[in-house]
Amino acid sequence: MELVFQWEENPQTAEQVFSLGQKAVALDDSQPTAHETLAYAYLGKKQHAQAIAEAERALSLDPNFADAYTTLADILSFAGRPEEAIRLVETAMRLNPCYPASYLWSLGHAYRLAGRYEEAIAALKRVLTRNPDHLTAHVLLAALYSGLGREAEARAEAAEILRVSPNYSLAVVRQRMPYQDPAELERILDGLRQAGLK
């Protein structure tokens, strides 16, 4: 996921990961982790169909690969298919009951896109219980609270965003969030703008 949101400072990193993922798949097409890595690399390039195909290939190679379920869920969420994403994250959580906070983020993101806002807030708060500095959990919460008219909470989340990443801005969100539907990206940006992010 760090690749998708380009948290790495070096802009060549995303291209290197993409290139290495392609090489890994070319060397051994039977490795599910290679396909999962390549799926995220395609998502980072906003090539949703290719990302879905690679994540599905990872799961066909290892149907018990819990992380690949959340990878596919993230891709489907960004592609506008949140209900499918929710089911996939639930499957991942059954396969890996000691799941990381990233699974909760994937669930919260999908809930938000499905219009299940209170469930999204609950999942994202659980992410922050595990990792108070989880940047994109704060981002989604700020946008959610703004959309629900909960201005004080939205502004508090915007302050947390800037605490975690002082240079974070709407321009960063526009560049890094790989939504297939431009209107969805605009909804996030509007919510963050209302929360006070510039």
Describe these PLM feature segments.
Residues 25-26, 57-60, 91-94, 128-129, ...:
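Conserved structural position within tetratricopeptide repeats
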Residues 167-198:
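Terminal, low-structured helical/coil segments at or just beyond the last alpha-helical repeat
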Residues 34, 68, 102-103, 137, ...:
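TPR alpha-solenoid repeat register
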